[in-house]
Amino acid sequence: MKNIFTLTFILCSFLAFAQKKEKVKGSKIVKMEQKEVENFQNLEVEDNLEIFLVKGNECAIEIEADDNLIEYVESKSAGNTLKLSTSRDITSSKKLSVRVTYTDDFKMLIAKNETNITALSDITLDNITFKTYDYAKLFLNAKTKMFTLMANDKSKVELNLKSEKTTIDLSKSAQLKALISSTSMKFDLYQKSKGDIEGDIIDLDLTLDNNASLDGEKLVAKNAEIKAEGYSTAKIMVATKVIINASGKSEIQLYGEPKIELKRFTESAVLTKKPSK
């Protein structure tokens, strides 16, 4: 039995070592290199790459990095998905970025680890989804018919959006700062996520739970349905009608002069009516 435990420990240690990337530092001499890629609809980015998005007629990538690091920037195609990552643990560099050209077929971007994603121009697509994890950062302007954002872990997103239909889901400790104009928006915040939102929404479906917080004092919704639970907090302005479901120790600060319907109001929930500024 002791031999089995010893063998298991050695095997686990070997696997952990095998999965650990070799560390490398950049030369500080920057070089650019273009790489051919297959057409893609989805983009997955990992590690600590800086990504710049630009729209074009054909899919392409251009790497700008320290000359000894370019070979470690990997691009792999799997079906309709392009995956970008590094094969080494790059501890320092003068430049480590990839300019990604997407087309009208672009559907989804997934960002993980410490990636930094910036759209160099407005993303104008019918339907696009962004998913962020770990410590990823996302900066973009978008004009779409349907827009979906799912931010998780400690990722941060800054967004300027015009969309007909918007779906946003924040969880864990994700943060969103945004200016949004949308016909309809479903907005869910969970755990310790935070939203700082301005803009105009016609129909808003808002859900908050756990310790989530929303600062929407400058977000004007014509109609809203709000569900607040746990220790969540929300500041929001509603113009015409609001339906409220509040429980736990949730707190809602309501601005504007809407018709208020208390559908459910239990436990230690607090609703405070605030004057419009």
Predicted region positions:
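Intrinsically disordered, low-complexity terminal regions
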Residues: 1-277
